Amino acid sequence: VRNRISIRKLLAIVLAALAVSVVVLNWTYGRLPAEPKPTGSFAEVGKLRIHYGEHPGGGGGAPVVLIHGLPGTTGDWEDVAPLLAGHRTIAIDRPGFGYSGGGYVPFAEQLQALHELFAELHIVHPILVGHSYGGTISLGYAERYPGQARGLVLVDAAAGGQHGGGYERAQAHFVKFMQLPVIRQIANATFGQLLTTVSVNQREDEAFHPEAVVAVHHRRVLAINMTRGNLEAYAGEMLAANGVVAQIDRRLTSIQTPAIVIQGNADELVKPARGRRLAATLPHARLEMLYGGHMQPYSHPAAIAAAVGALSAAKTSTAG
């Protein structure tokens, strides 16, 4: 009996020590950085407040709108925007992400918000540059508003048969649950920050592979994309993504807007076959297969800028 009691006490001590260790790690290694203040501007679009950064440009090229993925912020284009000096360039925080409010905003409502934002900012016939799910948004906009976009640069776009699996959906459900007010408060005080940091580290490694993770991007994801509103938007989009991508894929042949598909040949999130299929299905598209993973805005900003230049200089007879 004494041995059993001793074993129970020992187990209790071990479990208590583990619990304390997790809490300590939660507030040391796992502690999330403070959210920095926004540096861009805001536009009121319906019930949404959209954050954007503008680079005026002066070369007379077509206006350019940079649309981040899932998740993301305007900062994802920090290496691309300076290369577009000949264009008025606007990088947006999609509704629900970055500093744009709204939590989860459904796909169709995002397209409407983009259209209204363009009117508000006097953006006419822009070239849309969409990364990952931002590419899906760009395709959706071109399909819903034919003739409004001059061209599309689709960077590792979530299309061409892209389909998330059970793990991604389970993760999204878990993230959604963890944003419940009381749950989030308890988790953040005990283990939530540690779990978030470990999860982000793993996802970042996968996204940047075979290149190294860019430190400034990693910190920005932790500081901005891990806030409650951003995570609500992330979970909602992840759960809706399969249906949205399937819907867009069915309509690809109707999109007459000229497009350049930029695809990483080692992308682990959007496989190269997806990019090939997308480029082959769109009526007026060409494929640029580049070395690298999913984060082409960091690894190949010059290639993205060159694609913008090519679309800006091209005739627009097929745009529509």
What are these regions (language model features)?
Residues V1-A62, A85-H87, I123-V124, V308-G309, ...:
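Alpha/beta-hydrolase fold catalytic core
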Residues G30-P33, G164-G166, A189-S254:
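Conserved alpha/beta-hydrolase catalytic His-Asp/Glu region
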Residues L48, E54-Y99:
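Conserved HGGG/HGGXW glycine-rich cap/lid loop of the alpha/beta-hydrolase fold
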Residues G53-P56, A91-Y133, Y145:
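Active-site loop/oxyanion-hole signature of alpha/beta-hydrolase fold enzymes
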Residues E143, L152-A189:
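Flexible "cap/lid" loop of the alpha/beta hydrolase fold
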Residues A240-N242, N265-V270, M295:
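Acidic catalytic loop of the alpha/beta-hydrolase fold
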Residues I255, V261-Q263:
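Short beta-strand/loop motif that positions the catalytic acidic residue
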Residues H284-G320:
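Catalytic active-site module of serine/aspartate enzymes centered on a nucleophile-bearing elbow/loop
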